[in-house]
């Protein structure tokens, strides 16, 4: 098996390396090699700005189709990007749920209208998403979800609580798994709803850690 890189792949690595050198400057220098799990001293706001900087360079969702705003990188190029990123001690990434979870879900199962509405703002860094799966009494067991959604007229009305919604305080949208069938149990009767965070009835509270932080 040949593990040598092609000329195109070497050029790709150089493009990534050069871009990182040119953009990890100014306030982003303080994030170099930081921002990973356990680095509580790194401000999330600055990490979000770094995500937007990556978006300007076209480095968010590099595996997404070009037609929707991605780079359509091959699997090898994706690996090379992350390898080069780590070698450059580039800033630790936020849990970008739009890029890693919602975007791929919409590309696989969403309508063309949903894809064109939601995916480009994710890849441009203009809209940040959080995840609405886990619940206080269910943990991450989605078969035990209690949050309910009822269709009233042309609007869905949600009632419930979600936890571990990382970066909810900064998010523009949340994708929520809720029960839309009245007497459903376990995995049946669940729906996947896209919900704006800025609306009446949505409240966000921090989770107090054992350290008090």
Identify the role of each PLM range.
Residues 1-96, 117-124:
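Amphipathic, small/basic residue-rich leader segments at the start of a protein or domain
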Residues 94-113, 139:
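N-terminal glycine-rich flavin-associated loop
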Residues 125-133:
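A short, Trp-centered hydrophobic/proline-enriched beta-strand micro-motif
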Residues 147-150:
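A structural signal for short hydrophobic beta-strand segments in well-ordered beta-sheet cores
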């Amino acid at each position: 098996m040949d593990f040598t890189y092609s000329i195109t792949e070497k050029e790709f690595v150089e493009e990534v390396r050069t871009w990182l050198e040119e953009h990890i400057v100014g306030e982003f220098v303080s994030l170099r090699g930081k921002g990973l799990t356990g680095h509580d001293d790194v401000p999330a706001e600055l990490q979000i700005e770094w995500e937007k900087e990556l978006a300007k360079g076209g480095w968010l969702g590099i595996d997404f189709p070009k037609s929707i705003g991605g780079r359509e990188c091959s699997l090898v190029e994706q690996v090379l990007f992350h390898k080069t990123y780590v070698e450059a001690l580039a800033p630790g990434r936020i849990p970008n749920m739009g890029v890693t979870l919602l975007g791929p879900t919409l590309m696989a199962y969403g309508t063309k209208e949903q894809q064109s509405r939601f995916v480009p703002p994710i890849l441009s860094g203009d809209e940040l998403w959080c995840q609405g799966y886990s619940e206080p009494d269910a943990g991450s067991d989605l078969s035990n979800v209690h949050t309910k959604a009822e269709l009233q007229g042309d609007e869905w009305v949600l009632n419930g609580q979600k936890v571990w919604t990382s970066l909810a305080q900064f998010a523009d949208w949340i994708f929520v798994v809720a029960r839309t069938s009245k007497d459903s149990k376990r995995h049946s009767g669940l729906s996947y709803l896209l919900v704006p965070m800025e609306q009446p009835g949505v409240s966000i509270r921090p989770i107090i850690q054992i350290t008090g932080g």
